[in-house]
From Swiss-Prot:
InterPro entries associated with the record: Ribosomal_uS4 (IPR022801), Ribosomal_uS4_bac-type (IPR005709), Ribosomal_uS4_CS (IPR018079), Ribosomal_uS4_N (IPR001912), S4_RNA-bd (IPR002942), S4_RNA-bd_sf (IPR036986)
Functional summary from the UniProt entry: One of the primary rRNA binding proteins, it binds directly to 16S rRNA where it nucleates assembly of the body of the 30S subunit. With S5 and S12 plays an important role in translational accuracy.
Protein name stated in the entry: Small ribosomal subunit protein uS4
Biological process according to GO: ribosomal small subunit biogenesis; translation
MF-aspect GO terms: rRNA binding; structural constituent of ribosome
Organism: Chromohalobacter salexigens (strain ATCC BAA-138 / DSM 3043 / CIP 106854 / NCIMB 13768 / 1H11)
Residue ranges of coiled coil: none
Pfam families from the UniProt entry: Ribosomal_S4, S4
Top-level lineage group: Bacteria
Keywords: Ribonucleoprotein, Ribosomal protein, RNA-binding, rRNA-binding
Gene Ontology cellular component list: small ribosomal subunit
Domain S4 RNA-binding residues, every copy: 96-157
Length: 206
């Protein structure tokens, strides 16, 4: 499946919530008419079946992290193989992706922009260039913007946006040095309460 490159608001409207696909400069409610689904004007949401709810939750999380269907299923399989709560482990695997960590550190204003920075070799992990967005960052890893990329306007803008958004507890960031430390894998309580990972587990357990 190809990566979606269409309007970001369309995806957020489809899921009925902010997927954080845009920079956050303008409030979500002003950017996207979230109460209306894409398509015919004025069309409202219908009551979903249990399967429909499970599918929508999976799509919401998959789109939020910018992961393709096959990749997402592989993350679920890996989470199911590990010891612990499968849904929580799934979210932790997604949060540990390098593109997500770059976004969390504020070097990219969106996960999509962070993914571009990684693929364009603007990011290093422990001093070594890594250009694989799905690279799993481990506790203690230091993620930094490479010297040649530090003057990019989009990174400077992203850091300004991140300052307003605030830092997350599991990451330390030195915005002046443009580097940060992934202190620990986040606990479930640290992550969005707007995600019901149990619905995803129910979907894939069928």
């Amino acid at each position: 499946m190809a990566r979606y490159i269409g309007p970001k608001c369309k995806l957020s409207r489809r899921e009925g919530t902010d997927l954080f696909l845009k920079s956050g400069v303008t409030p979500f409610e002003k950017k996207c008419k979230s109460e209306q689904i894409p398509g015919v004007h004025g069309q409202r949401r219908q009551r979903l079946s249990d399967y429909g709810l499970q599918l929508r939750e999976k799509q919401k999380v998959r789109r939020m992290y910018g992961v393709l269907e096959k990749q997402f299923r592989n993350y679920y399989k890996e989470a199911a193989r590990l010891k612990g709560a499968t849904g929580e482990l799934l979210l932790q695997l997604l949060e540990s992706r390098l593109d997500n960590v770059v976004y969390r550190m504020g070097f990219g204003s969106t996960r999509s922009e962070a993914r571009q920075l990684v693929s364009h070799k603007a990011i290093a992990v422990n001093g070594r260039t890594v250009n694989v967005a799905s690279y799993q960052v481990k506790p203690g890893d230091v993620v930094s913007v490479r010297e040649k990329a530090k003057n990019q306007a989009r990174i400077q803008n992203a850091l300004g946006i991140a300052a307003n958004r605030g830092d997350v507890a599991w990451i330390d960031v030195d915005s002046k040095k443009m580097e940060g430390t992934f202190k620990a894998v986040p606990e479930r309580g640290d992550l969005s309460a707007d995600i019901n990972e149990n619905l995803i587990v129910e979907l894939y357990s069928k």
